[in-house]
Every structure is written in structure tokens, then in C-alpha cells.
């Protein structure tokens, strides 16, 4: 028992000796001061760090990097728009409220007062169409001299298509000259098809200067001038004259083209079918004779003794046969000369006209 106690004393002494050697090698162990923990927030000041730069390296492990409280307090009531940078080395950009980041709201433009045009659709219903009073790109300005030399400005509007129920759906755009308020008078028959539309024209003196009647089916404007049309033309209204020419000339051209197209359908129905030839004839016999030019066929042969002439047309053979017989049926009434061909007589008469 005594030996065991002696061994324990030796072991304790050896361990205490080794502990003292370890303390001499490593140095004193630093202890934390409770007052230093309370002043942790003030450890970020440069004076504290400069006083003890690296004496206690263990203290730097307990430093918690945080942004200054004044920065956090200034942003407490503001909504977070972007991620917050908590580093000390980067300057913090000032945050803008969410209301300042929104697009500016433009006030709406005040609506323009439209003009109303009353269009009577039947005996008891009236439909109004709105036309803006401001000048649109489709508006045309024209000036004229009124009574007393006072200039009058005419505005040529284009009435847009008015979406009306049932019978008024066939109306289209109509150019007209307006001075105060244009009126479009429309009469509808009982069968439901829209009739002609009469549009009045207002002159420089404020009186009616004619009217334009438009057929909705063909949309071909026709002009019917009134009694005061001559005075309106004499007053030198350039706007009215240009508008009347615009409505009158296309109507005449369309009317003539319509008659010509009907005439072509009735008469010029025989057309040559050879490539590159566009000849059209009113009779099939003329087309048949024309086709012989392409084929080279000459069925008409001269029967005079010793003559071998052939012709593609019978009138050419008759004209040639007069050379053999000497017959000259075409006689001049001024000089009693005779010719075998009618075209020769026409050339001869021109000489009398020039003398």
C-alpha cells in the first residue's frame, strides 16, 4: 500500500512538472473580461484597434461584423427594393422609395367635342353620327371669296362609314364641302335596298350651289346643279369647281366605259386565236378572212384568160377583175373622172379641197 502511494506521488509530481514546462512554453492563457463583452459594439472604432493591434488574437474571432446602427435606422421605414450590401468597404447607395420607381402617369388628353350629323333612316327614326371638329389628315382646306370680299374657308371632310342597323349598312365614305353642318338626306324604298344619296353643296355666299347624287350600288357620283350653279361658278369658288370636276368627270368616264364594254360584248366577240395576234372582228366572215393571212390560204382565183392571180378575200378579187374589164364605177362629181377603187376617189377629192 505504501508502495502504491509512493508511485502515485511520483506520477503527480511528474505531471505537475510537465504542466509547468507547458505553461512556460505556451505562455499565460488569456481570460475574458465581462466588461469587455459589454463594450463589444464599441470595438469597431479605429482607436481601439490601433491600441492593441495583435496582442490578443483571440479577440478578433469574437468580433461580429455588422452595419452601423444609424444606417439600419434610416432604412427601417422604407421597403427593400434590392439586396442590402452589409460590407464596410463598399459605399451604400441611397435607396429610392417604390413610388419614385414607377413610370410617370400622364394626364389623359381632354376629349374633343364632336359634331353630330343627323341621318334620317325612316319616317320616325333618326340616327346620329359623330365627326370630330379637329382637322384630321384626311381633311382638305380650300379658300374662296364671299360677298364683300371676305375670305371664306371651306373644310372638306370625309364622312366615315356609319355602322347603322339593317338598311343603312350599304353606305360608304362621301367627300363633301361643309361650311357649318353638312346634312346627308337618304331615302329608303320599301324593298330594303338603299336608294341614291343626295349631298348638298354650300357655296361661298352661304346658299346652295348644287347637289351631288350618289348611287350606293355602283358608288358612281353624279352631279345635278341647281339654279344657282351659274352664279356660284361666276363667283370664282375654286373649291367648288375642283369638287364639281372631281364628281363630274369620273361619272362621265365610267358611263362611257360601261357603254363601250357592253358594245364590246355585243359586237367584238370574234378574236383571232393565233399567238401574238390580238385582232378582234365584229363578224365571223372577217375573222375567217383574217386567219388566211396567217395560214397563207388564197381560195379566190382570177378566171381571166392567162391570169393566175389568187386572193384570200372576194372583194380583192372583184377589185382585181376590174383591171381586166376596165370598169370604173367610182366617179368624181366635180371633174367627172372615174376610178376603179373607192380609196382612189377619196384621194382625188382631197385635191379639190386643197385647191
Curated annotation (Swiss-Prot):
Pfam families reported for this sequence: zf-C2H2
Presence of keyword Ribosomal protein: no
UniProt PTM: Sumoylation at Lys-64 represses transcriptional activity and reduces cell cycle progression into the G(1) phase. Has no effect on subcellular location.
Cross-link for Glycyl lysine isopeptide (Lys-Gly) (interchain with G-Cter in SUMO), residue positions: 64
GO molecular function ontology, one term from the record: DNA-binding transcription repressor activity, RNA polymerase II-specific
UniProt GO cellular component terms: aggresome; cytosol; nucleoplasm
Motif (9aaTAD): 82-90
Record SMART domains: ZnF_C2H2 (SM00355)
Keywords from the UniProt entry: DNA-binding, Isopeptide bond, Metal-binding, Nucleus, Repeat, Repressor, Transcription, Transcription regulation, Ubl conjugation, Zinc, Zinc-finger
Subcellular location: Nucleus
InterPro entries documented for this protein: Znf_C2H2_sf, Znf_C2H2_type
Residue spans, zinc finger C2H2-type: 270-294, 300-324, 330-352
Residue ranges, annotated region (Disordered): 19-52
Family of the protein in this entry: Belongs to the Sp1 C2H2-type zinc-finger protein family.
Complexes and interactors: Interacts with corepressor CtBP2. Interacts with PIAS1, PIAS2, and PIAS4; the interaction with each ligase sumoylates KLF8.
Function: Transcriptional repressor and activator. Binds to CACCC-boxes promoter elements. Also binds the GT-box of cyclin D1 promoter and mediates cell cycle progression at G(1) phase as a downstream target of focal adhesion kinase (FAK).
Domain notes: The 9aaTAD motif is a transactivation domain present in a large number of yeast and animal transcription factors. In KLF8, the motif is inactive.
Protein's name according to its UniProt entry: Krueppel-like factor 8
Species, as recorded: Mus musculus (Mouse)
Taxon lineage: Eukaryota, Metazoa, Chordata, Craniata, Vertebrata
